[in-house]
């Protein structure tokens, strides 16, 4: 299992992100300003996008696990990775919720 940052061609991963947020224009917005990570275990199993919200707050804008791989700990692994990676930079890790109907 490997977690890596995605710096280019982020939209190639949009299908999985759309599972967690149906508004593609919102995804486009936070992909531009956010940092994206994918978790690979043979292939992409999960992904997330985080943004710096200021005042020591890091927000998870989107986190999605491939439906066939849910319940296998991939989402937890991403959360644990983020908490560890950003522990010294941020005092709060929060999950944003969408305003989609």
Please describe what each predicted stretch is:
Residues 33-35:
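Short loop/turn microsegments at loop-to-beta-strand junctions
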Residues 65, 71-84:
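Conserved acetyl-CoA-binding loop-helix of GNAT-fold acetyltransferases
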Residues 6, 37, 99-100:
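C-terminal "cap" of GNAT-fold acetyltransferases
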Residues 86-98:
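Conserved GNAT acetyl-CoA-binding A-motif
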Residues 27-31:
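Short loop/turn motifs at secondary-structure junctions and domain boundaries
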Residues 38, 43-52, 56-64:
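Conserved beta-strand in the GNAT
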Residues 1-26:
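Short amphipathic alpha-helix that is part of the acyltransferase structural core
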């Amino acid at each position: 299992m490997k977690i890596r940052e995605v710096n280019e061609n982020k939209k190639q991963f949009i299908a999985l992100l759309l599972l967690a947020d149906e508004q593609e224009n919102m995804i486009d917005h936070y992909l531009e300003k956010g940092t994206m990570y994918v978790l690979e275990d043979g292939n992409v199993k999960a992904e997330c996008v985080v943004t710096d919200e200021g005042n020591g707050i890091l927000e998870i804008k989107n986190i999605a696990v491939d439906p066939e791989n849910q319940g296998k700990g991939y989402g937890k692994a991403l959360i644990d990775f983020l908490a560890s990676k950003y522990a010294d930079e941020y005092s709060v890790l929060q999950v944003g919720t969408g305003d989609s109907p």
